[in-house]
Amino acid sequence: GVLPFTGIDEPVQGILLGSVIIVVTGAVDDLVSLRPWVKLVLQIAAAVVAIRHGVVIRILTNPGDASAEAIALGALSVPVTLLWIVGMTNALNLIDGLDGLATGLALIAAVGMGGALFFIGYPQATLVYFVFAGSCLAFLRYNFHPASVFLGDTGSMYLGFVLSTLPLFMKSSDSLFVSLGVPMLAMGVPIFDTALAILRRTLRAVLTREEHGADEGNTRVMQADTDHLHHRILRQLVSQRKMYTPTM
């Protein structure tokens, strides 16, 4: 094992080491603004570290049908897990456009996952999620509008990384729905917003490439915009405080 994490279970080591990469990446990005592709490569590196330590989606099950046979992902385990971790990390990062929004959504997701785990008989995992939720709630006191402390890329990427990796070292098949289903439901808004942003920017890049050339089009894919769901709701409601209810 790695010296600072000696004696800790291997999957937990992977999450901790991956978190270090995510936090350092976010801190550097907050200070000097990394290129989007550099940030993506480092996010993938963090996910690979977690995967190499056993944080992997190996099977898919149907929680509504106890008799249904579990589907082994086999060779697809690694790419599916990589997509899940990097996708969730970016989902929280992209949704962090207003005071308290990413923190509030992470809080809701953690409470939802902790509650689901409690009802299927995982008290220790429940405690982990409720501690995580408690830290989000304490931070939200200072992050809610008007915020005095901000997540930055460091905090938002870390929240997404932890929420995506924590459930994945539970081994039993009956917990898999909690591992993927509950996070996807609780994080539905940022996941949908991320998918929409990728589609929107890709379409704009194609149109830009036709008008101004390939280099300009490629830049547009990585370029931030103000067309996220929370920006659209804010333009309609004017007040940040009013917009939290429909978003969360």
Description of each model-found segment:
Residues G1-E10, V28-L34, I51-S67:
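Transmembrane alpha-helix boundary signature
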Residues L76-L92, L101-A102:
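Function-critical hydrophobic alpha-helical transmembrane segments in multi-pass membrane proteins
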Residues D29, S67, N90, V221-L229:
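Juxtamembrane loop-helix boundary motifs flanking transmembrane segments in multi-pass membrane proteins
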Residues Q13, I71-T81, T126:
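Membrane-interfacial loop-to-helix junctions in multi-pass transporters
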